[in-house]
Curated annotation (Swiss-Prot):
Localisation per UniProt entry: Cytoplasm
Family according to the record: Belongs to the SmpB family.
InterPro entries found in the cross-reference section: SmpB, SsrA-bd_prot, SsrA-bd_prot_CS
Name this protein carries in UniProt: SsrA-binding protein
Xref: NCBIfam families: PRK05422.1, smpB
Pfam families the UniProt entry points to: SmpB
GO biological process, one term: trans-translation
Gene Ontology CC terms: cytosol
Gene for this chain: smpB
Organism: Bifidobacterium adolescentis (strain ATCC 15703 / DSM 20083 / NCTC 11814 / E194a)
Amino acid sequence: MAKEQGTKPIAQNKKARHDYAIEDKYEAGLVLTGTEVKSLREGRASLAESFITIDRRGEMWLEGANIPEYLNGTWNNHAPKRKRKLLLHAAQIDKLARQTQAKGFTIIPLSLYFKDGRVKVEIALARGKKEFDKRQSLREEQDKREALRAMRYANKQVR
């Protein structure tokens, strides 16, 4: 079988971009079992309530991510919401650990995808938005949409 090329998205954390202001992004590998990979190949995953922690030994963990059991799995199927280890360089983990000590910063998963046949997680160093920030960003997006709509309408009238 030929080796897979390119990226294939599995799951997005859409709420994260709404609730957090993203400062910096990283790509991390993920330690998985065989049935987890098979379940991900079927496109079954959710990052909705997931978060990332750094333990005392300097290891990063993805917690709360839901990868449902593989339907054709046997007795050795995985637990759907277990902790999963993230693979990053030690220097990157140290940098993220220092930055999360700063006020208001946290590490969140943004997306889960296959890259050249391996499962990767896009994680971000983020700061939580206040309620008025969320409303303002929604208003800005709506204004952009209305401006594009008006420009399309004006261009259509010219023809």
